[in-house]
Amino acid sequence: MILVVGLGNIGVEYENTRHNVGFMLIDLLLKESNFTNLTNSKFKGELFKIGSSLLLLKPSTYMNNSGLSVKAVNDFYKCERMIVIHDDIDINLGALRFKKGGSSGGHNGLKSIDTLCGNDYERVRIGVGKGENVISHVLGKFKSEEEITLSKVLEHAKKALLELIENDDLSAISSKYSLKA
């Protein structure tokens, strides 16, 4: 079983914010897939299954406690692989990077996952840039001119993620799909 986690915050006030790009990519995948909804309160998030071996998770624990949801799903399904999609303020909007393991880079959602599940998982890092005030920036909505760039990056990230799930070769995917901005 492969678990793909899109990080974000629940609630209308957080829709279309920079911190929710993980949710956005999961939503894009669901829009184009036949899936089974496995959402259950024990998973602390929205959980979907595509085919026989792919789980998509949107934690409903808010960003800083994402690890609670990830651990609940991982413990129940004993997933062999985990891929986490998240915003990254250290790369510009329009950039896309891939990584396995390493530090959280100050990202509280990743810190929570690392604490409860370890850090040996693949990451899809979607650049959102860094504003003057980090918290206001990541919780802020995208400007209309940024939405065009975001849409292109999400579509590109979707293709990369689908290929990564299929081929399990992070290095090749990184070479083929990384974007600079």
Curated annotation (Swiss-Prot):
* Major localisation: cytoplasm
Any single GO molecular-function term of the entry would be: tRNA binding
Task: Point out the annotated site residues (description: Discriminates between blocked and unblocked aminoacyl-tRNA).
Answer: 9
Compartments it resides in:
Cytoplasm
Q: Which EC numbers characterise this protein's activity in its record?
A: 3.1.1.29
Q: Which reaction does it catalyse?
A: an N-acyl-L-alpha-aminoacyl-tRNA + H2O = an N-acyl-L-amino acid + a tRNA + H(+)
InterPro entries linked to this entry? Pept_tRNA_hydro, Pept_tRNA_hydro_CS, Pept_tRNA_hydro_sf
One GO location term (cellular component):
cytoplasm
Q: Which residues form the active site?
A: 19 (proton acceptor)
Q: What SUPFAM superfamilies does UniProt report for this protein, alphabetically?
A: Peptidyl-tRNA hydrolase-like
Report any one BP term from Gene Ontology. Answer: protein quality control for misfolded or incompletely synthesized proteins
Keyword Chaperone applies: no
Q: What class of enzyme is it?
A: hydrolase
**Keyword annotations:** Cytoplasm, Hydrolase, RNA-binding, tRNA-binding
Instruction: Kindly list the residues the record flags as site (Stabilizes the basic form of H active site to accept a proton).
Output: 87
Tell me the superkingdom of the source: Bacteria
Give residues annotated as binding tRNA: 14, 62, 64, 108
Subunit structure, interactors included: Monomer.
Q: Which family does it belong to?
A: Belongs to the PTH family.
Entry function: Hydrolyzes ribosome-free peptidyl-tRNAs (with 1 or more amino acids incorporated), which drop off the ribosome during protein synthesis, or as a result of ribosome stalling. Catalyzes the release of premature peptidyl moieties from peptidyl-tRNA molecules trapped in stalled 50S ribosomal subunits, and thus maintains levels of free tRNAs and 50S ribosomes.
Official protein name in the record: Peptidyl-tRNA hydrolase
